Amino acid sequence: LIDGFPIDVAVRTRAPRSKVFKGEAGYGYCASKNKHFYGFQGHLLVEARGIPVGFTLTAANIDERDAAYDMMDIIAGLLLGDKGYIRPEFKEDCRGLGIDLQTPLRKNMKDDRPKSFVKVIMRVRRRIETVIGQLAEQFEIERCRCRDRWHMTSRIARKLLAHNMGSYLNISAGKAPIQFESLIAAA
């Protein structure tokens, strides 16, 4: 499972005057939140159980399909992405690397796959949305309180480590990996 999320650096109206990440950050658009932003975009690779296994950080104006190439070496087999990963050249590159990229198609595209398969894709894709939602709400991964890229990547790595530790504790206790409510109640 692969998806991206925005990381705001400054409010869009203040971005031209912002000195933080000048020359590194960019302007982008997040379709799921229907907002334009100035900052970075995080790209997360999650395994089937919901445990993050890969992450890359790009300027917001970099296409998420281009950022996915940074994580291609750790992907094998089936890869589920959202509609933002639809591009024939990208799909061919994935096929050449032994990766079967499956995405939901746009409304104006013909889908030859069985409807039951598409429903399974959509149901499994919710898992990465859940993980990104947890990282955003419980770990505030979308907030930038840093002034340089090293500290930002370090901060994000710590948050991903905390998420993975919570998943590990749940697996050790015989629970679903991304159900953190029971960990909070037990503390």
Put a short name on every predicted segment.
Residues 1-106:
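Polybasic low-complexity intrinsically disordered regions
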Residues 8-14, 112-114, 155:
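Short, solvent-exposed polar/charged micro-motifs at secondary-structure junctions
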Residues 64, 124, 153, 157:
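Hydrophobic (often cysteine-bearing) scaffold residues that line and stabilize catalytic clefts
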Residues 78, 83-151:
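Helix-centered, glycine/charged polyanion-binding patches within enzymatic domains
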Residues 154-187:
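C-terminal domain-tail junction helix/linker
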